[in-house]
Amino acid sequence: MTLMKKMLGAAATVATSASFAVAEPALIFDLGGKFDKSFNELAFTGAQRWADDTGNSFREIELQSEAQREQALRRFAEAGNNPIVMAGFAFASALGDVAADYPDTKFTIIDMVVDAPNVRSVVFKEHEGSYLVGMMAAQASKTGTVGFIGGMDIPLIRRFACGYAQGVEAVNADIKVVANMTGTTPAAWNDPVKGSELTKAQISQGADVIYAAAGGTGVGVLQTAADENILSVGVDSNQNYMHPGKVL
């Protein structure tokens, strides 16, 4: 099984509840696109399920650059879309600037807290789920070495890594954890080539189970792990179907 932020899709669903049926909701995906097989796609799945269940519609946009964050927020707010849901912590700064200008618009941000009366912040205890992943990886490992590949090097992803390492240690303190971050910019969420390279490097160090908390970059991790006949663990959405029998 894969680790899932079970409430991510639900957050998009709740935020676009029937109480807002008069106004059309909007969903803004983070960089990487809505079909990243991870974080964005789970938000899209939740919103689409709401649309299917209620017969209502929602607007959406896939960002191409950082500069579009505030533009997209203002565009939807000006159009009267309500609520406006953002998939990702990186919207925090733009939302802080925009929310006060549209007090009658409800905003929802995932993975970050923005303190404003018209903002609902949805955050998770990533380290707790990752602790269980670490226990599972330790139990599955035959080499005594497991790996972790994060996306952007930020406190959020370090919480994933920390919980994972503690879970491994709880099962067997002698197991080695090899950890790498993909990068320090938002591009780290959508670099499957780099994910593949890091996976190969960790395999060369003996890792036979690798956990990816890296958004779209994780696609490269899971693919390479399957190609090299080792196990992987996905994140944010159920990724077992991508490589049956190879994804825990």
Predicted regions and their residues:
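Gram-negative bacterial Sec-dependent N-terminal signal peptides
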Residues: 1-23
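A residue-level marker of the well-folded mature domains of exported/periplasmic proteins
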Residues: 20-248
